Regions:
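Solvent-exposed beta-hairpin/edge-strand motifs
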Residues: 376-391
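Active-site beta-loop-alpha junctions enriched in small/polar residues
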Residues: 13-15, 49-51, 109-113, 180-182, ...
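Structural recognition of the beta-strand scaffold that forms the well-ordered cores
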Residues: 7-12, 42-47, 104-107, 173-178, ...
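Carbohydrate-binding surface patches
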Residues: 290, 296-299, 304-306, 340-379
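Aromatic-lined carbohydrate-binding/catalytic grooves of carbohydrate-active enzymes
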Residues: 32-96, 100-168, 172-184
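Catalytic cores of secreted or luminal carbohydrate-active enzymes
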Residues: 291-339
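C-terminal beta-strand-rich structural cap/linker in extracellular carbohydrate-active enzymes
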Residues: 396-415
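Glycan-recognition surfaces
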Residues: 131-138, 151-152, 158, 162, ...
Length: 415
């Protein structure tokens, strides 16, 4: 089974929108291999519109000419990804990423290009044309590129088979499929068809569904057909969004397990929005970034870095390479909140090996606050604790206590 632990990597969206190019992907991959890989970071993911030759930002150019082959399958734009020229697709770039010991991922939109349907291009491996399988009534509300498919037709599966076999030939390890996770009920069958094509392509590919919020009542369906799915709309560097994530995390945490992970979205840390401002930087304070990383790790969300890695400062690099905090993702089980109020939250997660607990304390208020979990709440006798951000060792008398500045967090290994 793939995705036995939450996937960890980098995604180009937060820093480059639709405009990332091959040199940028390569430099981020090289940085990951040198500075992050040893800590568990491994996926390098090219986000939306890699097939659009003139993309420049997070905005979409309406009805732009897209790069695709004779079967209506999108291809990397050679002007942005030079190694793809001559029909090579993403294979040369994926080969480079693999040569670093990393894994390569791409973003796709559900469906097929509208251009492919309008031009009546054939579907590889069957007798139907794209125009016969495309559903013009199934379109994305925020991107103009695609039509959904008539998934009651076997030729819809043939189209998805053709693109996933191509991704497998390229060496793709991760596919983020967009405009689908929150589109229940009308995209339920399309999720199943995409998942089946992904699993039948001959290569292990992690399937991630976006955007959120995915409906909680569809949790079992999502767990059956995807490896991760978004529980929120796009998450950005705003405190109100981070504070709101505590409610979502509480609802979804029980569904986190090997092979399927509720996804709280990317980590907007470091250098963001580079397509607009080369000096762009996260609006989160250092305290808020600790809170975000602590919550994501406690709920065992996938971790995808959103910033331009080569511009990481010392704080950002240390935030992303704290072995003890990152270990929560791989060694804990059954994480859940003890409580969450307007002003504070406390989470607990036993280690799978039974050797102790992780305890996270959060100050959600606008002033310094002391947050305490009593020994009775821990449901056991524990005498020692280590705070994982600072390394401070504590002797416990009755529970765990931390005095935290506004929007800050502490996380303890208790034994």
């Amino acid at each position: 089974m793939i995705a036995q632990t939450p996937p960890m990597g980098w995604n180009s969206w937060d820093c480059y929108g639709a405009a990332v190019d091959e040199p940028t992907v390569r430099q981020n991959a090289a940085y990951m291999a040198e500075h992050l890989q040893v800590f568990g970071w491994e996926y390098v993911v090219v986000d939306i519109q890699w097939y659009q030759p003139t993309a420049t930002s997070h905005a979409y150019e309406p009805f732009a000419e897209l790069t695709m082959d004779e079967y209506g399958r999108l291809q990397p734009a050679p002007g942005r990804f030079p190694s793809s020229a001559g029909g090579k697709g993403f294979k040369p770039l994926a080969d480079y990423v693999h040569s670093l010991g990393l894994k390569f991922g791409i973003h796709i939109m559900r469906g097929m290009p509208r251009m492919a349907a309008h031009r009546h291009l054939p579907i590889l491996g069957c007798g139907k044309g794209c125009h016969e399988v495309a559903n013009p009534n199934s379109i994305c509300a925020w991107n103009p590129d695609m039509y959904g498919l008539r998934c009651d037709m076997p030729e819809a599966r043939a189209y998805y088979d053709s693109i996933f076999r191509m991704y497998a030939e390229w060496g793709v390890d991760f596919v983020k499929c967009d405009d689908i996770a929150r589109e229940y009920p009308h995209c339920k069958r399309e999720i199943e068809v995409i998942s089946d094509a992904c699993r039948a392509c001959g290569r292990d590919i992690v399937l991630s569904l976006s955007p959120g919020p995915a409906p909680l009542e569809q949790a079992e369906h999502l767990k059956k057909y995807a490896n991760m799915w978004r529980i929120t709309d796009d998450f950005w560097d705003e405190w109100r969004l981070l504070k709101g994530m505590f409610e979502r995390a509480e609802k979804w945490c029980v569904h986190a397990a090997p092979g399927h992970w509720p996804d709280a979205d990317m980590l907007p840390v470091g250098a963001l929005r580079q397509c607009y401002d080369q000096n762009g930087w996260t609006n989160f304070t250092q305290a808020e970034q600790r809170t975000m990383m602590t919550l994501w790790c406690m709920m065992r969300s996938p971790l995808m870095i959103g910033g331009e890695l080569t511009k990481n400062d010392d704080f950002t690099l240390k935030l992303l390479t704290n072995r003890d905090v990152l270990a929560i993702e791989k060694t804990s089980a059954c994480a859940h909140p003890l409580w969450t109020t307007e002003d504070e939250s406390a989470w607990i997660a036993p280690r799978r090996d039974g050797t102790g607990l992780y305890v996270a304390l959060f100050n959600l208020s606008e002033e310094t606050r002391t947050v305490r979990v009593t020994g009775e709440m821990l449901e056991g006798t524990y005498s020692e604790a280590s705070e994982l951000w600072t390394g401070e060792k504590l002797h416990l008398a009755d529970g765990v206590t931390a005095t935290l500045g506004k929007h800050d967090a502490a996380v303890f290994w208790v034994e």
